């Protein structure tokens, strides 16, 4: 008997990033590679599911998640040079480290891309989201997004109520959403970075 494998890992993988300034669309693995489990992501408040991307219109699992979490709003966003107006500018904006005062929910129905999130020690974790993967980033987590080398993702965006996509670029540690995130997920270390820099 083989060991139990989480089927989410086929559409969601995560690892610690290196510090290289090379093309942001490359994997940026450390050497040796340091993978991060989906359970570790959950401890940062990052939730994930594997869903049937070919049948999202009739998927009962998606319907249950939306009802349970109150995701009343839905639309789609295609990110690629041909489909996104002001592509270069948008991609730069997506890759600026920022937070939101609400959850960011993305369900990849085609293509793939990277969501980078900060861990408790302010290190970057790269989350590779592929077709069928759905991810929820909690309000208040510092993160950023980029395409991978395939240069294409089509994602369903979900939201509770009317959508607000306002990014607050780092630093915005004074926002209640950030304070609540730190309290919920124990990121006390992040506050010490300011002290370290001044020492």
Swiss-Prot record:
EC id: 1.13.11.54, 1.13.11.53
Cell compartments where the protein resides: Cytoplasm; Nucleus
Entry keyword annotation includes Iron: yes
UniProt keyword terms in alphabetical order: Amino-acid biosynthesis, Cytoplasm, Dioxygenase, Iron, Metal-binding, Methionine biosynthesis, Nickel, Nucleus, Oxidoreductase
Gene3D superfamilies (UniProt xref): Jelly Rolls
Binding site for Ni(2+): 98, 100, 104, 143
Gene Ontology CC annotations of this record: cytoplasm; nucleus
Gene Ontology MF, one: nickel cation binding
Residues engaged in binding Fe(2+): 98, 100, 104, 143
Transmembrane intervals: none
SUPFAM superfamilies named in the record: RmlC-like cupins
Cofactor(s) demanded: Fe(2+); Ni(2+)
Cofactor note: Binds either 1 Fe or Ni cation per monomer. Iron-binding promotes an acireductone dioxygenase reaction producing 2-keto-4-methylthiobutyrate, while nickel-binding promotes an acireductone dioxygenase reaction producing 3-(methylsulfanyl)propanoate.
PANTHER family named among the record's database cross-references: ACIREDUCTONE DIOXYGENASE
Function: Catalyzes 2 different reactions between oxygen and the acireductone 1,2-dihydroxy-3-keto-5-methylthiopentene (DHK-MTPene) depending upon the metal bound in the active site. Fe-containing acireductone dioxygenase (Fe-ARD) produces formate and 2-keto-4-methylthiobutyrate (KMTB), the alpha-ketoacid precursor of methionine in the methionine recycle pathway. Ni-containing acireductone dioxygenase (Ni-ARD) produces methylthiopropionate, carbon monoxide and formate, and does not lie on the methionine recycle pathway.
Name assigned to this protein: Acireductone dioxygenase 2
Species this chain originates from: Vitis vinifera (Grape)
């Amino acid at each position: 008997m083989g060991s139990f494998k989480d089927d989410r890992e086929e559409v969601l993988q995560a690892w610690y990033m290196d510090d290289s300034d090379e093309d942001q669309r490359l994997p940026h693995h450390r050497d040796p590679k340091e993978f991060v489990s989906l359970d570790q992501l959950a401890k940062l408040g990052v939730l994930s599911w594997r869903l049937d991307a070919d049948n999202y219109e009739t998927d009962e699992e998606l319907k249950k998640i939306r009802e349970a979490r109150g995701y009343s709003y839905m639309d789609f966003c295609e990110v690629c040079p041909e489909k996104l107006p002001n592509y270069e500018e948008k991609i730069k904006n997506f890759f600026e480290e920022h937070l939101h005062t609400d959850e960011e929910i993305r369900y990849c129905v085609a293509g793939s891309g990277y969501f980078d999130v900060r861990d408790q020690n302010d290190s970057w974790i790269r989350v590779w989201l592929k077709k069928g993967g759905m991810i929820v980033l909690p309000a208040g987590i510092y993160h950023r997004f980029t395409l991978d080398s395939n240069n294409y993702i089509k994602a369903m965006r979900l939201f509770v109520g009317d959508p607000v996509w306002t990014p607050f670029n780092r630093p915005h540690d004074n926002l209640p959403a950030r304070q609540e995130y730190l309290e919920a997920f124990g990121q006390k270390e992040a506050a010490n970075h300011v002290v370290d820099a001044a020492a």
